[in-house]
C-alpha cells in the first residue's frame, strides 16, 4: 500500500519517483556497465544479481529485531535492490526494455525458525520467508534476469553480478573476471589478443588494462576530485 501511494503521488503530481541503489556505483559494476554500453560484450542476453549474506551473527544487532521480524512476516525476495539495480542498468530497463514476466520460488523456512527457537525458545509454525528465494524475470525484448536472496544459510557474501553477452561474459563473485572473444579485446590493450580464447578468464594483466581503458567517467571524475 505504501509503494502504491508513492506511485499514485508521482503520477498525480507528474514528478519523477525512483528507487536509489548504492551498489550501482561500485568500481567493477560501473566499469562493466561502461564496457557493455560500448559493445564489448555484444548483445547482453542474461544478467544475474543477488543479496547473499548470512546474518546469523547479526540478527540481534537490528533495532527491535526488525529484520528477523520482516522475514518472519513477509515472503519473497525482501531485499532485491542490491542485485536487481545493476542488472537493470545492464539491460537498459526503462530505457528501451521492460520487465514482462516474473516467476519466484522459495525453499521452505528452516534456519529462521531455528534461530528464534534457539534464542527465545519460541516455536514458530508460520515463518513466512524461505531460506532462499530465486526469481527469474523475462523482459519484453527477450532478455532474462536471475535474482537470489539468502540471509539464512552459510554462504560467502555475494551479490552475484553476472553478465552473459553474445561476445563476452563478466562476473564479480567470488573473483572478478571477464571472458571475451579475442577480437573484442582492443590491440591497444593486448598486442597478441589472438592468443586469448572465449572459454577462459582473461589473464589478470589483460583484465587490469581493460578495466583501466573502460574506467567509467564517474570514477575518473572522482579520482580527479580526490587529487
PLM feature segments, named:
Residues 144-146, 169:
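Short, mixed charged/polar active-site loops
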Residues 12-18, 23-127:
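Predominantly a Rossmann-like dinucleotide-binding segment in NAD(P)-dependent oxidoreductases
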Residues 111-127, 138-139, 167-227:
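C-terminal glycine/acidic-rich active-site capping loop/insertion
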Residues 2-16:
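Rossmann-fold NAD(P)-binding glycine/threonine-rich loop
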Residues 81, 126-131, 139-140, 154-155:
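A short catalytic or substrate-binding loop motif that flags glycine-/basic-rich loops and adjacent residues
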Residues 147-158:
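Glycine-rich phosphate/pyrophosphate-binding beta-alpha loops
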Amino acid at each position: 500500500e505504501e509503494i502504491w501511494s508513492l506511485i499514485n503521488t508521482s503520477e498525480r503530481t507528474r514528478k519523477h519517483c525512483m528507487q536509489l541503489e548504492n551498489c550501482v556505483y561500485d568500481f567493477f559494476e560501473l566499469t562493466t556497465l561502461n564496457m557493455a554500453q560500448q559493445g564489448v560484450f555484444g548483445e547482453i542476453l542474461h544478467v544475474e544479481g543477488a543479496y547473499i549474506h548470512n546474518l546469523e551473527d547479526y540478527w540481534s544487532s537490528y533495532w527491535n529485531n526488525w529484520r528477523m521480524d520482516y522475514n518472519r512476516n513477509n515472503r519473497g525476495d525482501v531485499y532485491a535492490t542490491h542485485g536487481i539495480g545493476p542488472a537493470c542498468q545492464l539491460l537498459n530497463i526503462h530505457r528501451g526494455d521492460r520487465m514482462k514476466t516474473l516467476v519466484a520460488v522459495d525453499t521452505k523456512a528452516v534456519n529462521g525458525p531455528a534461530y528464534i527457537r534457539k534464542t527465545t525458545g519460541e516455536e514458530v509454525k508460520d515463518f513466512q520467508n524461505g531460506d532462499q528465494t530465486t526469481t527469474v524475470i523475462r523482459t519484453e525484448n527477450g532478455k532474462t534476469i536471475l535474482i537470489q536472496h539468502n540471509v539464512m544459510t552459510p554462504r560467502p557474501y555475494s551479490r552475484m553480478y553476472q553478465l552473459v553477452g553474445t561476445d563476452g561474459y563478466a562476473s564479480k563473485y567470488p573473483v572478478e573476471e571477464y571472458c571475451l572473444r579475442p577480437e573484442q579485446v582492443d590491440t591497444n590493450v593486448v598486442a597478441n589478443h589472438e592468443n586469448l580464447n572465449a572459454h577462459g578468464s582473461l589473464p589478470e594483466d589483460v583484465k587490469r588494462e581493460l578495466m583501466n581503458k573502460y574506467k567509467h567517467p564517474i570514477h575518473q571524475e572522482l579520482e580527479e576530485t580526490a587529487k
